Curated annotation (Swiss-Prot):
It comes from the Eukaryota. TPR repeats lie at residues 211-244, 262-295, 296-329. There is a cross-link at residues 239, 261, 263, 274, 297, 304, 324, 330, 338, 341-342 (Glycyl lysine isopeptide (Lys-Gly) (interchain with G-Cter in ubiquitin)). Residues 28-39 have a biased composition (Acidic residues). Disruption phenotype: Mice die shortly after birth. They display neural tube and skeletal defects. The neuroepithelium is disorganized and the formation of dorsal root ganglia is defective, likely as a result of an increased frequency of apoptosis and aberrant migration of neuronal cells. The extension of nerve fibers in the spinal cord is also abnormal. One of its GO terms (molecular function) is disordered domain specific binding. This is Peptidyl-prolyl cis-trans isomerase FKBP8.
Amino acid sequence: MASWAEPSEPAALRLPGAPLLEGFEVLDGVDDAEEEDDLSGLPPLEDMGQPTVEEAEQPGALAREFLAATEPEPAPAPAPEEWLDILGNGLLRMKTLVPGPKGSSRPLKGQVVTVHLQMSLENGTRVQEEPELAFTLGDCDVIQALDLSVPLMDVGETAMVTADSKYCYGPQGRSPYIPPHAALCLEVTLKTAEDGPDLEMLSGQERVALANRKRECGNAHYQRADFVLAANSYDLAIKAITSNTKVDMTCEEEEELLQLKVKCLNNLAASQLKLDHYRAALRSCSQVLEHQPDNIKALFRKGKVLAQQGEYSEAIPILRAALKLEPSNKTIHAELSKLVKKRAAQRSTETALYRKMLGNPSRLPAKCPGKGAWSIPWKWLFGATAVALGGVALSVVIAARN
């Protein structure tokens, strides 16, 4: 990201050539060195009037040279621990190259920081430089190596950070510059740290710009299969859209924010599906459908969530509604066909279970479990009633003869 207004590739973690979620399956402290004692500031010794014995018997020049040669040299100050192991696992380390000015402070979570970043591979190959990279600290807008190391720096400080690939671009890398599983060296200068924007005082266009930045970060995390961070970024985007405002907005701005909210909710649902958070995904889809009942992506994902929960009878009509809106969509066709087969298998299993419960599976018709379940009890009931009535009549006849 070259500036705060328009984040560039490193800030947004975007993978070149990655789709922007249009499909259904895809979205869709360092110690200072000890200094020697400085005696220049001490007050002068008082004049005692008469020299002491030691003063009266000062050694000559040869003696002074001998004493100087035989005096042990002062022990050097212990070297400071240069590298800070940030997480204690040796995979993310930081060393101060240039300390910050005296009195400078460290940034806080939620502040907007601006850094000068130089990124290199372990062999020294420079792969990226950002003179003015701005991001919100703690919002996961950048790679974790930056988000974890910058809070330990003073404003004005320059530090070297070495990071394992898991805190950078992971197993996917970032083609064509950063190969998969690549550890990186980051030279970071913390230039400024300012409080984040007051959401209530943002104009409509400022809200749109902020929400779009968070959404793009979420898309980049999703492409790297980091669905937890993706969901976090989409949540932040939705918060920027839906938070209270003290600024009047035009109808066009409100409509633009609504469309952006729908996109973020759809992408959030996709991330929640990947994390198997079905109830949360169902809520996200339902919120989309409240605004846009014919939103195909929301219908598709809602049907898929219900299918994952085994609710095939509810999922199939929803997918059919989505297919009716877009009959040529092969993804919906395939999912619907799969669910129809699963429902048929589910019904077959239920029928077999009913037969087993009734204890006479051979006499029960497979196509009409309800009728078969009641046919035998009613026949026995009528037969037993007839026998009982016959017995009563016979008793009456015998009693009359007697």
